[in-house]
A protein has these predicted regions:
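Extracytosolic ligand-binding ectodomains
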Residues: 1-174
């Protein structure tokens, strides 16, 4: 996986040398604004990516988040904005439910808790404490000299986590 300036260098050299011509490319994270913005008009088209298409998510939850974010910061959110927001909202919900800072009470409060998010409700599984926050999957494209995601769909994390029996095999009880 390549990040920011390394990704820009790879894309620039790959485009120059025809590395991506007639080749399917899958690139995790590249659809996030944090990665598309530095690519600008060099964004390769048609890559299959995960990311955050903040400009095309049309749900009441995301609309409320987007409006509040833009009003406060006069900018658009990045995926890091969502992750940070969800981390704090989840911690606050767990603390409120536990009504304590005792570690065992916090663990018990976190197990199975549901929390609203800009992507819809998420929860933390009781069996392994994994969040069900999902990911947007789509393709890269150019619009007005900038990289964007198109043909996106949100994939719920709960649909891709291992079933309880598999978790039990992987994490035997002590």
């Amino acid at each position: 996986m390549l990040f920011r300036s390394d990704l820009v260098k790879l894309v620039r050299e790959g485009n120059t040398r025809g590395l991506f011509k007639d080749r399917a490319v899958v690139s995790f994270l590249t659809g996030e604004p944090e990665y598309l913005d530095p690519l600008k008009d060099e964004t390769p088209e048609g890559w299959i990516v995960t990311g955050y298409p903040w400009y095309s998510i049309k749900t009441p939850e995301h609309d409320a988040f987007l409006k509040a974010y833009q009003a406060k910061y006069n900018d658009y959110p990045r995926l890091g904005s969502i992750v940070g927001y969800e981390t704090i909202k989840s911690a606050a919900a767990i603390l409120a439910k536990a009504n304590s800072t005792d570690p065992e009470k916090l663990i018990a409060a976190a197990e199975g808790i549901a929390v609203p998010s800009p992507f819809g409700e998420i929860s933390f599984r009781k069996i392994d404490h994994q969040s069900t926050l999902g990911a947007f999957v789509g393709k890269t494209a150019l619009k007005d000299g900038k990289g964007i995601m198109v043909d996106t769909s949100y994939r719920k994390g709960s649909d891709y986590l291992p079933i309880d029996a598999e978790v039990e095999k992987l994490r035997p009880k002590e």
